[in-house]
Regions:
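Soluble catalytic domains of enzymes that build or remodel membrane lipids, polysaccharides, and related
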Residues: 1-169
């Protein structure tokens, strides 16, 4: 809690849910993150500084997950402004591409976490780690900080990805 409260950004700190929130006590975890100053975006969009949108997706394990195009329409997202989508699992990049997202950010894969998992994730996900561009959408999948299952990494690294974003007219 204390460490998360140290996260600060001039325009706010935003996140989306992932599969681990839904393993148990999801609502308590989400409330805890909100109390720590992290705005959890749950199939919702927020206009930042009247300049761009951040859209947070519910994880694919959430049964009432809403299609991205519906979120954008329901929240009257101005498609002439840049749209950044936070989506935990990179299992359907076409949804963000087809919805016209400018940037789509993902996690989930842990970059395989331990060899040979990093090879396996490349077989499962179109983009398992790093940067790619698909259509007009810039995609980044981070290996993240956390671990799933075994508490080690082999052949991959934990990371905090720092992206410098500049939108041109």
């Amino acid at each position: 809690d204390e460490e998360l409260r140290r996260l600060h950004a001039r325009l706010g700190v935003y996140s989306c849910t992932g599969n681990h929130e839904y393993r148990y006590e999801a609502e308590q975890k989400i409330q805890w993150l909100n109390r720590a100053g992290i705005s959890m975006l749950r199939d919702s969009a927020v206009l930042i500084d009247s300049a761009f949108y951040v859209v947070g997706r519910e994880d694919v394990v959430f049964p009432e997950r809403v299609p991205l195009s519906e979120i954008l329409n329901r929240q009257n997202v101005n498609r002439f402004k840049p749209v950044i989508v936070l989506n935990h699992s990179p299992n359907d990049l076409d949804e963000e591409v087809n919805a016209g997202a400018d940037i789509a950010l993902y996690g989930h894969t842990h970059h395989g976490q331990a060899f040979p998992g990093n090879i396996a994730t490349r077989l499962v996900f179109e983009v398992a780690y790093g940067y790619a561009r698909k259509g007009d959408t810039h995609i980044y999948v981070t290996s993240g900080l956390g671990l799933a299952g075994p508490q080690y990494r082999i052949g991959t690294v934990s990371e905090v990805a720092v992206l410098n974003v500049k939108f041109e007219k």
